[in-house]
Swiss-Prot record:
Residues 142-190 are annotated as: Domain III. It is found in: Cytoplasm. The lineage of its organism: Bacteria, Pseudomonadati, Pseudomonadota, Betaproteobacteria, Burkholderiales. Has three domains with a flexible linker between the domains II and III and assumes an 'L' shape. Domain III is highly mobile and contacts RuvB. This is Holliday junction branch migration complex subunit RuvA.
Length: 190
């Protein structure tokens, strides 16, 4: 299996890039978020990869972060979601948005991605629950580190993602952690 490629970026044609690794050019499919974070053609690039073998093709998918690759791996385990659809989901919303949609059970956000219908969105929510990493979902709700700490505290106190996110939205953006927790608990007790 090919787990990582490091080499010179030769071509960028979304969603595909060509990476030269010691004289061998690898065609790699990437999500749009990874594509937009790539360096200029001719510069060094490093991509984490997932190698997929099918009857008719051997395909290489590249990712800028370990979280994106892990989300891709979880997505392709789901019935009805192949590599192309998984890449489309990651291109359409990114890992943090996907984790947030899953934690808040928002099928409507997934349906906005081309190729995802209502039934597939519901299946994604069901099968991805708890698999994308709690920290990614928590950080997706929070605008800054203080808000992330407040949200983490509310979750630790037993509030669910929806309740904690709603309480967080009601807080001023510049609130401190201890004051934010007090205000959030007050709003949740109503």
């Amino acid at each position: 299996m090919i787990g990582k490629l490091t080499g010179t970026l030769l071509e960028k044609n979304p969603p595909e890039v060509l990476v030269d690794c010691h004289g061998v050019g690898y065609e790699v499919q990437v999500s749009m978020s990874t594509f937009y974070n790539l360096p200029a053609v001719g510069e060094r690039v490093s991509l984490l990869t997932q190698f997929i073998v099918r009857e008719d093709a051997q395909l290489l998918y590249g990712f800028g972060t370990a979280q994106e690759r892990q989300a891709f791996r979880e997505l392709i385990k789901i019935s009805g979601v192949g590599p192309r659809t998984a890449l489309s989901i990651l291109s359409g919303m990114g890992v943090a948005d996907l984790a947030q949609a899953v934690s808040l059970q928002e099928a409507g956000r997934l349906v906005k991605v081309p190729g995802i219908g209502k039934k597939t969105a519901e299946r994604l929510l069901l099968e991805l629950k708890g698999k994308l990493g709690a920290d990614v979902g928590v950080r997706a709700h929070a605008a800054n580190d203080n808000q992330a700490d407040i949200l983490q505290a509310l979750l630790a106190l037993g509030y669910n993602d929806k309740e904690a996110a709603a309480a967080l939205k009601a807080l001023p953006a510049d609130v401190g952690v201890s004051e934010g927790i007090k205000l959030a608990l007050k709003s949740l007790s109503k």
